[in-house]
């Protein structure tokens, strides 16, 4: 199998062309490839497939290191876009893709930056999915060690965002797993911890479902900004500083798509026997 190793702000991926290669990924194979000591090592595996819809360019699949398939990864989307251009799978700079839960537009810029139209944030609890009677800007979520005030949203995958005073001392190692597997999230959740610097600048750490804390989470950055805007504490254009680097997020509010812009870096190409 031919593959590329890429990263988006330190969130690392193996990207595979399943357009020209006939490849199937059982859970056991994904886990073996994800092993950083015995395999390649990655946070997520990204698979480029032929489009299911003739009006689209590709189908985008994402697998976590534990073998579970998810429907969205913002950092991965940027790497996906750069990959298909680098490998000559398309000569377009604006690329339309489908995912397990919808469609995305990816725009590859000349400076190696990629802008992703992430679509509209989803707030209805049953669509996230999240166990709640109605939408609220803040939900009280009780864990074994702490009661938290959280915003909950889907960016194609579920996110729970809570504000913290100091991102460096947030109890993410304990709270992250408790939120990820909380009973109110039937499909588990990505847990974001946000420190607000000002209305246009936040710091963020994300504990991703199936992967643990990562260097950066693009959909998590989008979710944090969307929650902050809905709660009235952030402006429409926000710089998000993650452990792995910086993203710019823009959202004009309900009825509008949310845009994420950031780097996508190609590290190396390789071949491995499955």
UniProtKB/Swiss-Prot annotation:
- What pathway does the annotation place this protein in? Amino-acid biosynthesis; L-lysine biosynthesis via DAP pathway; DL-2,6-diaminopimelate from LL-2,6-diaminopimelate: step 1/1
* Assigned keywords, A-Z: Amino-acid biosynthesis, Cytoplasm, Isomerase, Lysine biosynthesis
> Where is this gene product found?
Cytoplasm
Q: Which reaction does it catalyse?
A: (2S,6S)-2,6-diaminopimelate = meso-2,6-diaminopimelate
One GO MF term on file is: diaminopimelate epimerase activity
Catalytic site: 73 (proton donor), 217 (proton acceptor)
What domain of life is recorded for the organism?
Bacteria
Binding annotation for substrate: 11, 44, 64, 74-75, 157, 190, 208-209, 218-219
Q: Under the cellular component aspect of Gene Ontology, which terms does the record hold?
A: cytosol
- Class of enzymatic activity (EC top level): isomerase
* SUPFAM superfamilies recorded: Diaminopimelate epimerase-like
**What is the purpose of this protein?**
Catalyzes the stereoinversion of LL-2,6-diaminopimelate (L,L-DAP) to meso-diaminopimelate (meso-DAP), a precursor of L-lysine and an essential component of the bacterial peptidoglycan.
Q: What is this protein called?
A: Diaminopimelate epimerase
